[in-house]
Amino acid sequence: MASLGHILVFCVGLLTMAKAESPKEHDPFTYDYQSLQIGGLVIAGILFILGILIVLSRRCRCKFNQQQRTGEPDEEEGTFRSSIRRLSTRRR
């Protein structure tokens, strides 16, 4: 029985040595998902912060709901809104 144990240990030793010595082949379909995930999270974080800064800067306004700011030049003289503005400024 002792010889069977020795043979078993010898075979296991040979298998581990053969596995350790085999050169690692480069598999083109092995991807590094951890660096891909970290890169995606960094880009998502940058875009999120950029979006918050754009919203807080108030530079991006909707054109259909934008009120005329004071001090801006009037619209064209032929429009109805500009004629009302001219009349309202004369009364002041």
Curated annotation (Swiss-Prot):
The modification Phosphoserine is found at residues 82-83, 88. One of its GO terms (molecular function) is chloride channel activity. InterPro entries: FXYD_motif, Ion-transport_regulator_FXYD, PLM. Keywords: Cell membrane, Glutathionylation, Ion transport, Lipoprotein, Membrane, Palmitate, Phosphoprotein, Potassium, Potassium transport, Signal, Sodium, Sodium transport, Sodium/potassium transport, Transmembrane, Transmembrane helix, Transport. Residues 83-92 have a biased composition (Basic residues). The chain crosses the membrane at residues 36-56. Major plasma membrane substrate for cAMP-dependent protein kinase (PKA) and protein kinase C (PKC) in several different tissues. Phosphorylated in response to insulin and adrenergic stimulation. Phosphorylation at Ser-88 stimulates sodium/potassium-transporting ATPase activity while the unphosphorylated form inhibits sodium/potassium-transporting ATPase activity. Phosphorylation increases tetramerization, decreases binding to ATP1A1 and reduces inhibition of ATP1A1 activity. Phosphorylation at Ser-83 leads to greatly reduced interaction with ATP1A1, ATP1A2 and ATP1A3. Palmitoylation increases half-life and stability and is enhanced upon phosphorylation at Ser-88 by PKA. The cytoplasmic domain is sufficient to regulate sodium/potassium-transporting ATPase activity. Associates with and regulates the activity of the sodium/potassium-transporting ATPase (NKA) which transports Na(+) out of the cell and K(+) into the cell. Inhibits NKA activity in its unphosphorylated state and stimulates activity when phosphorylated. Reduces glutathionylation of the NKA beta-1 subunit ATP1B1, thus reversing glutathionylation-mediated inhibition of ATP1B1. Contributes to female sexual development by maintaining the excitability of neurons which secrete gonadotropin-releasing hormone. This is Phospholemman. The gene is FXYD1.
